[in-house]
Amino acid sequence: ANGDLDSYYGNLFFRIQSGRWAHNIILTCGWNDASLDRTAGIPGAGMYTMHGSTSGSSYGAFYEGTYDLYLNENNTSALQPLVNASVYRSRMDGFTESGGLGMNVDDMDSTFGTVGLGARLRGELSANLTGRASLGELRVQVVQLLGDRDTAAVLAPAGIPGAGFRVNGAREGATGVQVGAGITIPVGYTGSVFADVNADFRSRANSFNGSIGYRLTF
């Protein structure tokens, strides 16, 4: 089998700072396009090639609270104990594969949440001509997954909807360790370019991801 998944996300950031305490909220909305080509055979009947495609949406909310423990007199570097929580919902439309052994695929919705506890090390790296400093950070946290922990779908041979059955993917571990690093480089007076890399380690599922983008502060 061979497949492609294209995802498009938009994030809205909110941050409130009160003394050493900071509260961060991120609202996320996304759109997904997926396609799958697979080959299957029946003994004595040869091989068949099937194709399917679908789309869907996802949305979620994330909250994180931190407290600054400054590491120098200028308050330019800090160790931040942190706690966070999130909830996400995703939905993919049902579809019917084309091909000799095509299947109806449906019921792929999922809802899950996370709670995390960890720490972040942040510090200024350099300043640009506007006096704004580049920021770097390292972070580690333990995360507990709640809700749906595997991918599931209802399958039925095309044209025989009453013969459906549920298929469950691998069930990943509920507790994981996440590590990451990031850098933010100021651009002008209100903009900045950021880059992040992250890794998640848990039983039966390890993942790595990176992102780069532009953030406007106002």
List the model feature ranges, each with a label.
Residues 1-218:
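Membrane translocator/pore-forming domains, dominated by Gram-negative outer-membrane beta-barrels
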